[in-house]
Amino acid sequence: MEVKNIGIPHVLPPASVCDDPLCPWHGHLKVRLKLLEVTVEKVRMHKAAVVIHEWLHYIRKYNRYERRRKRMRVRVPECIEVKPGDKVIIAETRPLSKTIAWVVIGKKEDVVEWKAKHETLQA
């Protein structure tokens, strides 16, 4: 099966192939350009997982940052294997169910840094 170009240049496609229609690489699911780096918390649902997105929010009154976190449910295609504790890249998509509107597009290890790729092209 042919791997689609999802329009995100830094993320490598998975090595395995699936026939999942809701896979951005091998199916017909389109992704939007909102990307997040998150940590997988639970993988108990069928083809879905719960992830945690953590970020720092600046409080101007106290000149300090506070840590914020959000739990999100994401779709996990069959070609991407994830387990709790993995760092993954997720992309926004159309609503797939009542609570799922994001899909895993790859693990953090599968991301190619743009500068490193650009330097190798010029060398």
Swiss-Prot record:
Molecular functions (GO terms): rRNA binding; structural constituent of ribosome
The keyword RNA-binding is annotated on this UniProt entry: yes
A matching Pfam family: Ribosomal_S17
PROSITE patterns in the cross-refs: RIBOSOMAL_S17
GO cellular component: cytosolic small ribosomal subunit
Gene3D superfamilies referenced in this protein's UniProt entry, alphabetically: 2.40.50.1000
Keyword annotations: Ribonucleoprotein, Ribosomal protein, RNA-binding, rRNA-binding
GO biological process terms on file: translation
Function, as annotated: One of the primary rRNA binding proteins, it binds specifically to the 5'-end of 16S ribosomal RNA.
Family per record: Belongs to the universal ribosomal protein uS17 family.
Subunit structure comment from the entry: Part of the 30S ribosomal subunit.
Protein name: Small ribosomal subunit protein uS17
